[in-house]
Every structure is written in structure tokens, then in C-alpha cells.
Amino acid sequence: MKKRVLAASVLALVLSGCSSQVSYGDPQEVETVNVDFGSSDLQKIAGEMTESMISSPLLIDITSNNRPIVFVERIKNKTTEHIDTESVTDSISTKLLQSGKFRFVDMSRVNEVRDQLDYQNDGGLVDPSKAIAFGQQVGAEYMLYGNLASIVKTNKKTKDVYYKMTMRLMDLQTGIVEWADETEIRKAETKSTFGW
């Protein structure tokens, strides 16, 4: 009988040690789980690029009496990692919109907008006096685009990852790049006794 109680106790102890725990963390806190691109990197890049663009003397001049309309192209991922560049793009767009200096057109929703306008104008279900007419949208004046690249170096003990984010703002009428900047992140990871 004592053996069964002891075995049950040991089994309960082992199983309780295998259970996972979930907790909330501060999304602004720096996460350093590994050298891969993470949430801290996304926040750093979005913050630095937004601040650089808003504080650029040329863009201060452009936005002093006008809120230019911008089309934001999804950031291109030129790293070897799977990085959700849509999240980076969304964070930058959101911060710029919240600055109150820019307005945006969302090219990712063109088909849905077209479907809605077709429904309103051709379906016969919407009062024609209240339907939004085709050809009333405004076009973008500027295009914001960029890419995220990385260089990875490893040796027996260390893995070093360098990330570089480059962005540009182009005047769509003239083709002139009005603003460009880049920000960098470098991370290093030392190999433990049992591997990466």
C-alpha cells in the first residue's frame, strides 16, 4: 500500500512539473528570448522610422499646411527568417496616422471597396440617392516603402545577427524620393553547452 501511495505521489509530482504556466507580460518590455526578430525589434523600428519621418525638416514643411495622402507598400522581407512584415507596416502606418500629419489610402482593400460600390450602384437594393458614386476617391500623393534585411554570422560559440530597415517616401507625381532613413539592430547569442 505504501508503494502505491509513494508511486502516486511521485507521478503527481512529475506531472505537475510538466504543466505549463501562462502569464501576461508587458508588451513594451524588451524581450530577449533569442536573436530572432521579435516584438521589441518591431516596436523599435516602427518608433524610430516614424519619429524620423515626422521630424524631417522637409516633411515638417510639407505637412505644415496640408495632410498629404500616402500609400504604404508592405515592407519587403529580405531576411532569411519568416518575419510578419505586415505587422511592421501596420505599426508604422498607425503611428504616422496618429501623428495627425498624414492621411492614407489602403490599397489592400481595393477589391472589397469595388465590390461594395458595385453592390450599391448595380444591385438595385440601395437607394440610388444614397449610393456612393464611382470615381469619387482620391489618389495617393506619396508612396512609403522599404525593406528589412539581415546579415547572420556564426562561429562555434556565437551567433551574431544584424538587421537593417530602410524606408523611403516617394512623391508619386515627380518620382522624387523626398525622405529616406534606415535603422539598425544588432543581436548576439552565445552558445550554451547543449547548443543554440
Predicted regions and their residues:
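C-terminal binding/interaction regions
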Residues: T166-R168
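C-terminal motif of bacterial Sec signal peptides marking the signal peptidase cleavage site
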Residues: L15-G17
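Bacterial signal peptide processing site
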Residues: S19-V22
